[in-house]
Amino acid sequence: MDNADHIIEGRLVPSAPDARIVVRDPSTGEAFTEIGRGGQAEIDQAVASARAALGGEWGGLSAYERGRRLLSMAKLLRDNIDTMTALEVRDVGKPVAQSRADVVACARYFEFYGEAADKLGSETIPFQNGYTVLTKREPHGVTGHIIPWNYPMQIIGRSVGAALAMGNA
């Protein structure tokens, strides 16, 4: 596998040469790639990019359009299931069948939230005589996600899929 860096604003952003993490297959101990170690500069750049997206194209998408994008992500995962499974096996050290199930679960989360994106809206709740309460769902804004090493595919689907479906960046 090629070494990986950060993807910020749709572009590869390299880490400093001394800010690299060697990734090892936990079942063999074999190093198979290096990834960039993000620091404050990369975090600040990613947050600024996400804020700009909220004020730009992403923030202007309808819930339906966001949902379609999540469904596209699910399709990409399914179309590349063998590659994603092999990566998950090496990265996490799980057996092939379990890693494949995790990729499928990630795709299913993106499908679920993609299909739910335009179904969750405001509610009108009866209150007192002659009064109602209106609730309105709004995105929180920029969200950060901590992904554990042992279930990365499932947690990415579960947390990132939900956040994006609701309009967060």
Where are these regions (language model features)?
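Short glycine/serine/threonine-biased micro-segments
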Residues: 8, 34, 91, 139, ...
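Glycine-rich loop-to-alpha-helix module at the N-terminal edge of alpha/beta enzyme cores
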Residues: 32-120
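Short glycine- and Lys/Arg-enriched binding-loop motifs that mark or flank ligand-binding interfaces
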Residues: 6, 89, 118, 126, ...
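Conserved small-residue-rich beta-alpha loop and adjacent elements
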Residues: 123-169
